[in-house]
Amino acid sequence: LTNRNVGRRDFFKIIGGALGISAISYYLGFRDKPDLPPSDASPDYADGGIGLPVFRGPYLQKDVNLAAFLFRADVNVLTQLCDRSLNIAPSSPYRYVPLSSNVMLVYADMLVSSLDERDAQIGSIPETEVGFWVLTVAMQKTSNGEVPHHLAWFLPTVFVDESNSIATGREVYGFNKQAGTFSKPQDIYSPHLTADVLGFKQFGGEAIAQKERLLEVSSSASEQTQTSWSDWRSVRDFFAGEIMNSIRADMGSAIIGFVAQALVDHIPLVFLKQARSASSAEKASYQKVVEAPLQIKDFFAGARLAQSYKLSITPLDSHPLAQSLGLQSEQTNLLGAWLKLDFVLGLGTEY
């Protein structure tokens, strides 16, 4: 399910088709953002005058040490995941479709602070997280069918070691953030790591949650010479090429061309923001799809990891990662990279 044999002539045909789709959808009004109520119509958020535990956005992540690993997954499972986690909000103008059969595991260790004038005075909070990222195409629903509108990164699961981050992420954006503890890499150039959770190996009326190893990323190979990047453009071009080579063949040439064009844009994150009803436990009192922009502020260093890494996932009833993401309990990565950078998670849009 890859497109590694796209030739130069075919590539330009695909790009031309994408430009045609974009132009048609633009002039028909399909690519316009839907009208949303003004934010000043909402009541003020009551926080007692202090931003803890839920800071005001936007949010600066600085001194970020990041490692990313790409793994093959079952695209049918990823489709089901998007359908039950994103495509259930009736007010959303989009249907999110996995772009490939790949999942990216991202480890990040950083300092997080608010860029809001008031909350920026609080300071920075250390945070470590491990999450899974799925690249999707947001298909806009129109009276004439669906048209590709933009790309979006879906983060179905993120584990974090800091409580304020969990509260802010879940409440503001709808991050599915859960508590975890980590053994961190000694240095980001050789990112061996583990993640533990409070969980259940098996559910049962008498079962008691305890600390369990959820996953491990390791390599038995010795550290090898790495291909480094001197600027963010080089990083972006590398990952854009890998994304183009991994697009599902059943997407068709028009979608492939659209993706080639869309990769030059900033790709937002997408979440399902919801709250369980207090009066009807099986219902949601609030449910919206949220998209939020993520922009690189400063890039310092980065390189592709030359050695292979193995992901080991422990089967837990409370955290069925392999089952929900279409991963194997043990598998080797397709590629990996480390980065040192700062980035900003901006204010989102609720649909």
Where are the regions a protein language model picked out?
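N-terminal export signals
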Residues: 12-29
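C-terminal region of N-terminal signal peptides and the immediate post-cleavage residues
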Residues: 31-33
